[in-house]
Amino acid sequence: MPDLDGLSTSELYKRFDQPREVPIQRVDGKPGEPHAPPHAIYPMALSIPADEVHDPEIIISDKRTSFIVPQTPSPTLCTPALYSPPEDFFNEPITHSTAADIWTLGVNLYEVLGERPLFETFAWDGDDIIAEMINSLGQPPTRWWNSWVKRSEFFEEDGSWVADFRRISTPVFGRLHQRLWDMGRGETEQTCEWDVAGGELRALEDLLRAMMTFEPPGRPTADQLLRYEYMVKWAFPAWERQKMQESTHPADKEH
């Protein structure tokens, strides 16, 4: 938005609405210190629907972190924590670097389709992210479950949430299946935006679960992903329809 810096405060509020304040409360219930701010402000939403973006230019930069896979048997990942694979959190060597990319792609795919992150945490804390992985995808491998130092702050031994939960997190989000239902914005097969009867919801869940398999060797390759049911029956046909629509009704080039 090239004209954003030139907006006055009133013009900014008129275009993007008033700031949203939320009171700050301490986890232990005690009153805040005198120097602490009484409120936090939600970030301003600058996003727009994808179908309203004209001629988007995607610029990719590796920030000097890319590497040649065959020549780098155990790379150091520079992936942001929210999108990092679980093996990186547990300090295991990245021996399947393409599998790490598949996990990251799966997390991104969910966010693109769902309009919100799959693993929602405060300040991208590593332990909160691990807990969200388990909450969404199920029990991790035993070696990770047993070696997780702060597991007792989240889960009982049987995998249930601790009753006296004191982390800055929200342990109420459902499993991946329920999140996909919520993403479909409907509570029945008739009102859900997914083609539930035709198998779209199931096929999408199968795709995402495969991409976010805890064990790296169990994740599909990129070539295998292209042959998954969701890609063949829904993603590719939707892409072809979109290309046909663009060729029939070219987007207005004026901004």
Name what the model sees in each region:
Residues 1-255:
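Intrinsically disordered, low-complexity regulatory segments of kinases
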